[in-house]
Amino acid sequence: MNNARKILSALSFCFLASATLSVAAQSVGYTKLNVKGRVQLEIPSDWTISDAEQRKRVKELGEKLVGIPILHTASLAAQSYPAPSRTLVRVSFIPMEPPITQADVRQEVQANKQQVLRDLADSWREESTTMWAGLAKNGVKEVGRPSFAVEPIGGQTALIIVYGRTSTANPAETMRVTQYHVPLGAEKALITLSYIEGDQQAIAAHNRLKSSIVIR
C-alpha cells in the first residue's frame, strides 16, 4: 500500500502572512507549549503567538493566494519577535482516512525507503504546482530545488519536505521551509518550521525549537 501519497494527498502549504499580535519585549526565557496534547515544543518567551482569529485569517489569505481550499486552520502559529519575523513555527492536525499509523509508515519505509521518497517527491511536484503559481502572482518565488527525507522528529517518524522561497518581507532573502508530516492514526500532525537562510540567530532559534519537539 502506497502510504506516502495518502499522507501527502491533503498537502498543506505554509502561508506565512505577517499577521501578528503586538507584544511587549520580555527577557528571553522559554515557554513550553502543548498543542492538543499531541505535540509539545518550546519557544522563546518573547515570540508572538497568533490567536485563533489570526490563524483563521492566515488560512483565508492562503486560499486567496493560490485559489484552492485549505482543509484546516493551524492549531498553533508562532513567530520570532520583532517583526518581520525571522523564524516561524506552525502546527496543524489534519484528518486521515483511512488512518495511517506510525507502524504502517515504518513498515513501508523498511520495505522500500527509496520508493517512499520517490512517491513523496512525485506527490509534492503534483500538489505544489498550483501553490507556486498562486504565490508567483504575489511576487513569491521558489528558490532552489526541494529535497525529501524520512527522519525521526520528536520520537516519531516523519515524511519531510524542504524547500526555499523568497521572503515576503525582503525578496532578496530566502526563507527555508521544512514540513514534517507525521501520521498518528486517524490524523497527521503537520509541523512547519521556517527561518531566513544565513541568519545565524534565526538558525539557532530554529535548531533549538526543533530539538524541543515531542510528539505523542
Report each predicted region and the residues it spans.
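Extracytoplasmic/secreted proteins, especially bacterial periplasmic and envelope-associated proteins
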Residues: R38, E42, T130, A204-R208
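Bacterial N-terminal signal peptides that target proteins for export
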Residues: M1-L11
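Solvent-exposed, acidic/flexible segments
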Residues: K36, L117, A121, T174, ...
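A mature extracytoplasmic/lumenal domain signature
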Residues: S45-W47, E53-Q54, F93-P95, V162-R165, ...
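Surface-exposed amphipathic alpha-helical segments
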Residues: W47, G185-R216
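Bacterial N-terminal signal peptides
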Residues: A10-A19
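N-terminal "mature-domain start" segment
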Residues: A25-S75
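Conserved polar/disulfide-associated segments of primarily extracytoplasmic proteins
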Residues: Q54-R176
